């Protein structure tokens, strides 16, 4: 990704997604209160923002040659679709997939939706990593499906233990930005 595009994405995140307070008022999914909140849906649900994230994340994952990329719904969904689009435009299609928080209660009762086959190499996506628990839930579902997880790829690493928790499971974490770079 061109440095100019990365800088443009960083500016968009700072302007639209990063919320900063004097006191810890933002409750994170981990239950912890924080002074900082990163709401990447303000970027991924915007055409330009989703394109920039798709392009940047594609550049991050493509060297690992995944067959597919996806993660826990809802944060990873637009990122997976954007990567799929950008990868197709580069004549290197990477399939998107979605991991439900729980297996579907009817029909095929799948937890993972996508055109996947056991044994395929997948990149697990995350919008923001804090403790890594959401990413690890997706990793577990992928492994149970028989997929080879090559890494967790995040837009933002909050630098609050997520990297260490993910790496304890033998999975590397790659991120476009660390929270400290955006403050």
From Swiss-Prot:
Q: Where is the signal peptide?
A: none
Enzyme group, top EC level?
transferase
**Per the UniProt record, which EC number(s) apply here?**
2.4.2.10
Q: Which GO terms describe its biological process?
A: 'de novo' UMP biosynthetic process; pyrimidine nucleobase biosynthetic process; UMP biosynthetic process
Q: Which GO terms describe its molecular function?
A: magnesium ion binding; orotate phosphoribosyltransferase activity
Q: Which Gene3D superfamilies does the record match to this protein?
A: 3.40.50.2020
Q: Which residue ranges run through the membrane?
A: none
What this protein needs as a cofactor is: Mg(2+)
Catalytic activity line of the entry? orotidine 5'-phosphate + diphosphate = orotate + 5-phospho-alpha-D-ribose 1-diphosphate
Keywords, alphabetical = Glycosyltransferase, Magnesium, Pyrimidine biosynthesis, Transferase
Residues recorded as binding orotate, renumbered to this chain, are 130, 158
Residues recorded as binding 5-phospho-alpha-D-ribose 1-diphosphate, renumbered to this chain, are 100-101, 104, 106, 126-134
Give the record's pathway: Pyrimidine metabolism; UMP biosynthesis via de novo pathway; UMP from orotate: step 1/2
Cite the record's note on assembly: Homodimer.
**NCBIfam families in the record, alphabetically?**
pyrE (TIGR00336)
Q: Record's HAMAP family?
A: PyrE
General function of this protein: Catalyzes the transfer of a ribosyl phosphate group from 5-phosphoribose 1-diphosphate to orotate, leading to the formation of orotidine monophosphate (OMP).
Family per record: Belongs to the purine/pyrimidine phosphoribosyltransferase family. PyrE subfamily.
Task: State the name under which the record lists this protein.
Answer: Orotate phosphoribosyltransferase
Species the sequence originates in: Aquifex aeolicus (strain VF5)
């Amino acid at each position: 990704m061109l440095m100019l595009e990365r800088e443009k994405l960083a500016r968009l995140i700072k302007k639209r997604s990063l919320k900063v307070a004097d006191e810890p008022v933002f409750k994170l999914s981990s239950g912890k209160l924080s002074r900082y909140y990163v709401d990447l849906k303000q970027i991924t649900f915007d055409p330009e923002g989703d394109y920039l994230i798709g392009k940047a994340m594609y550049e991050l994952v493509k060297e690992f040659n995944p067959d597919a990329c996806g993660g826990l719904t809802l944060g990873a969904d637009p990122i997976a679709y954007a990567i799929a689009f950008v990868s197709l435009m580069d004549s290197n299609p990477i399939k998107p997939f979605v991991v439900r928080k729980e297996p579907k209660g009817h029909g095929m009762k799948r937890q993972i939706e996508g055109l996947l086959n056991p044994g395929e190499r997948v990149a697990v996506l995350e919008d923001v990593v804090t403790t890594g628990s959401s990413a690890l839930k997706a990793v577990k579902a992928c492994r149970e499906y028989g997929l080879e997880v090559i890494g967790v790829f995040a837009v933002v690493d909050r630098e609050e233990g997520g990297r260490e928790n993910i790496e304890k499971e033998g999975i590397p974490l790659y991120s476009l930005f660390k929270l400290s770079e955006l403050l």
